[in-house]
A protein has these predicted regions:
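Membrane-interfacial helix-loop segments of redox and metal-homeostasis proteins
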Residues: 2-414
């Protein structure tokens, strides 16, 4: 008697792709959930909530392709300002949320303070160096995190360089901050709450209108954001892509949530020198960090002794990375991308060193100094923006030395 064998059904490429997507999504969400649980059990509920906020920041950055590096280069090279206009919306929402709370120095019964820093050479030079590093490293402080979370391993040398540059800058920090500088200026204190809001909104509108004028003059029309009619169903919330405006709103709201949770705005770059110092200690490098003025400031000396899971900025950065991992998985776009020409790897490492050094002496990066500084009403945030944008102009035009494209896609990424 002949037995008839029924051929086993073969999975179509579409089914295999869906299966892989679901598997990676489960892994990413499982890992994120475990980290949240571990923090709640071993650190505190606040650390758990901060990682969750970081996760949503990573999700928003990834799905909206919301960034600073490519958005600025898009304006510099292509005369397209959609990304920069989205940043102005983000800042406008932020000042409307932040300024009233910072004016009263209280939010939900807890003390809050902004980033009000001096205006001097350290900000001017540091931000300029950072701007060049953005373009060479193909990312900023937050961009490297969400690139790495999405599987783009090109972010790794840039992040390593960021740690090295940040640690290097802590050795020179006393010299830079000892240079002549103007005292910190808070627009809220100088003008009052309502005038401060109106002045900033007028500046944001002016920048947005300038990009529209420049874009129309160059292209005859303005590049539009993704219309809401294309957001077909609830899946788009989880799988993306999002319009830029969604990313702008979510980032502003979550930065405000960070202010409520920690008493100060979101920051990213400040974690990198700490990671570099921890690595140096692990490698038993004799750097005598205890004698560097940077590490003698309140909170920083204890950060060297404590676990990274106790550090607010490190926990939020890890959340951004894990959130981007989950976002890429849900979008079906997660894959390891590491095949790059050697010059690209060199540019990423060099750019990372410039990012770390520049951010540390300039009191922050695109998040802490630009976003957080302007949202705090500090004039140093505007000085940082001008200097970093000038650096990005230089960086954009030296990219070809490393065989990096100067043209950008229609979607902005950090």
């Amino acid at each position: 008697m002949n037995s008839v064998q029924t051929p086993s059904p073969e999975l179509t490429p579409e089914v295999e792709s869906k299966t892989g997507q679901y598997s990676v999504t489960l892994i990413s969400l499982g890992l994120f959930s475990y980290c949240l649980y571990w923090l709640q059990q071993n650190e505190s509920s606040q650390q758990m909530w901060l990682m969750l906020i970081g996760g949503f920041l990573g999700l928003a950055l990834y799905h909206a392709s919301f960034g600073f590096t490519t958005a600025w280069r898009n304006l510099i090279v292509n005369r397209r300002g959609r990304g920069l206009r989205a940043q102005m919306v983000m800042l406008a929402v932020a000042v409307c949320l932040f300024f009233p709370a910072l004016s009263s120095a209280e939010l939900f019964g807890e003390e809050v303070r902004g980033y009000i820093r001096p205006l001097g050479y350290s900000v001017l030079v540091g931000a300029f160096i950072f701007g060049i590093g953005m373009q060479l490293g193909n990312g900023c402080a937050s961009g490297n995190l969400y690139h790495a979370g999405g599987g783009q391993l090109r972010a790794i040398p840039s992040m390593f360089g960021f740690m090295v540059g940040g640690l290097w800058a802590t050795a020179d920090y006393e010299w830079w901050t000892g240079l002549p500088q103007f005292a910190p200026v808070s627009v809220i204190e100088e003008t009052g709450l309502i005038p401060a809001i109106m002045i900033n909104l007028a500046l944001f509108a002016g920048i947005a209108l300038f990009t529209i004028w420049l874009e129309k003059r160059t292209h005859g029309e303005v590049e539009k954001d993704q219309p809401l009619s294309e957001i077909a169903n609830w899946r788009r919330y989880l799988q993306g892509p999002w319009p830029f405006i969604w990313g702008a709103l979510v980032l502003a709201i979550l930065n405000f949530a960070t202010l409520a949770m920690t008493g100060r705005p979101w920051a990213v770059a400040v974690a990198y020198p700490l990671w570099g110092a921890k690595l140096a200690m692990l490698l038993e490098l004799e750097l005598e960090l205890d004698f560097w003025s940077y590490w003698l400031q309140p909170g920083r000396e204890t950060a060297l002794e404590e676990s990274l899971t106790s550090d607010v900025n490190s926990v939020m950065n890890a959340g951004v990375l894990l959130g981007a991992f989950a976002a890429a998985a849900m979008a079906g776009k997660f894959s390891f991308q590491w095949r790059l020409p050697i010059l690209h790897w060199i540019a990423a490492l060099l750019g990372g060193v410039m990012l770390g050094y520049g951010a540390t002496i300039a009191f922050g990066c695109n998040i802490g100094a630009y976003f957080g500084g302007i949202a705090s009403g500090s004039l140093h945030g505007w000085l940082w923006l001008i200097a970093a944008f000038a650096g990005s102009i230089v960086g954009s035009y030296i990219r070809p030395l490393f065989k990096l494209d100067t043209k950008t896609s229609t979607r902005s990424a950090c």
